[in-house]
């Protein structure tokens, strides 16, 4: 079974926790960890932005990544949420 870490950013801890809980309840993720705060620097609509954000890391199977990503897109407050799958090697 291939497993992945899913890296997701959110605007605040409340939203990150809500997303993590939803993913675990729906069995899209086995576990979710919320890490706070981080500073994100990115380009949006032609301008450099700098914001405080929260990172959610979800642990899941590779075959659930597409469904998990679609669910995050449905419930996330961002127009274009960051959802990145990283394969787990070892552990």
What spans do the regions from the language model cover?
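Positively charged, small/polar-rich N-terminal and surface patches that mediate targeting and assembly
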Residues: 1-91
């Amino acid at each position: 079974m291939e497993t992945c870490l899913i890296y997701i950013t959110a605007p605040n801890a409340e939203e990150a926790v809500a997303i993590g809980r939803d993913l675990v309840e729906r069995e899209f993720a086995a576990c979710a960890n919320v890490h706070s705060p981080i500073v994100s620097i990115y380009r949006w609509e032609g301008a450099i932005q700098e914001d405080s954000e929260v990172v959610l890391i979800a642990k899941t199977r590779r075959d659930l990544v597409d469904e998990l990503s679609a669910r995050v897109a449905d419930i996330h407050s961002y127009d274009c949420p960051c959802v990145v799958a990283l394969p787990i090697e070892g552990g």
